[in-house]
Amino acid sequence: MKNVNDSFVSLGHWPFAGSFGFNTDILATNPINLSVVLGVLIFFGKGVLNDLLDNRKQRILSTIRNSEELRGGAIEQLEKAWARLRKVEMEADEFRVNGYSEIEREKMNLIIATNENLERLENYKNETIHFEQQRAINQVRQRVFQQALQGALGTLKSCLNSELHLRTISDNIGTLGDMNMKEITD
């Protein structure tokens, strides 16, 4: 009981406030003031807190949606990049195959052209050899003919004397005369 009296006595020691107000000193407040403050905070703070949480939730959802859209766009770009890469690889393989076949075709064309050139050169060589052989044969024939002619002329000059010469001429004139007579009579 003494405690109860002391609490009333202690009320007498406190100075009275000149007006109604809130005591901001938490240690000096009583449970009624605390419950009023908590009630006001809960009543008004609930809406603010709900608004803050809703805004935060909307920002998080918006960020997630944006992230999903960016992820979807990135996946789409990645798929396009893979498709382009496959296409470029196929084109590179095609160019490589076509390049190799083109190289083989050019190689075969070059071999064929080289063989044709070799054949032409071989034919030209053979023609040149044949021509040189014919020329050499003709030169030998001319020399043999000239030597034979000179030998025959030398033999004729050594064998012919003026009497033989006159007799051959008269025989030839006689033969020509006989031929002329036959032609006239015929």
UniProtKB/Swiss-Prot annotation:
Gene Ontology MF terms: proton-transporting ATP synthase activity, rotational mechanism
Record has Transport as a keyword: yes
TM ranges: 27-49
Membrane topology term: Single-pass membrane protein
Pfam families: ATP-synt_B (PF00430)
Primary site of residence: plastid
UniProtKB keywords: ATP synthesis, CF(0), Chloroplast, Hydrogen ion transport, Ion transport, Membrane, Plastid, Thylakoid, Transmembrane, Transmembrane helix, Transport
UniProt xrefs under InterPro entries: ATP_synth_b/b'su_bac/chlpt
Highest taxon of the lineage: Eukaryota
HAMAP family: ATP_synth_b_bprime
Primary role: F(1)F(0) ATP synthase produces ATP from ADP in the presence of a proton or sodium gradient. F-type ATPases consist of two structural domains, F(1) containing the extramembraneous catalytic core and F(0) containing the membrane proton channel, linked together by a central stalk and a peripheral stalk. During catalysis, ATP synthesis in the catalytic domain of F(1) is coupled via a rotary mechanism of the central stalk subunits to proton translocation.
Note: In plastids the F-type ATPase is also known as CF(1)CF(0).
Family label: Belongs to the ATPase B chain family.
Name of the protein this chain belongs to: ATP synthase subunit b, chloroplastic
